Regions:
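Short, charged/polar connector segments at secondary-structure boundaries
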Residues: 1-79
Length: 79
């Protein structure tokens, strides 16, 4: 995988570190992110993962995908 290119991967293959799971997304931020997804069908924030498929950024987008039962999501790999 090359950094800077969009790839589609299964959400089940992305490993979400515990520190993301322990972080509460603020209500205002969550409502904004979910509203954006409902209006556009796209995530407002990119999902960034490393070469081992560990989530680096985009936890709110991953959470939306999980809640909505989305099986594959667009991601960008970072070094």
């Amino acid at each position: 995988y090359e950094p800077g290119y969009e790839y589609w991967v299964y959400t089940k293959d992305i490993k979400v570190p515990t520190y993301f799971k322990l972080t509460k997304i603020g209500t205002e931020k969550w409502n904004h992110k979910m509203g954006y997804w409902i209006r556009t069908g796209e995530f407002e924030s990119d999902i960034l993962i490393d070469r081992d498929f560990n989530l680096v950024d985009g936890y709110s987008s991953m959470k939306i995908a999980h809640i909505k039962g989305i099986e594959k999501v667009p991601v960008y790999f970072v070094d």
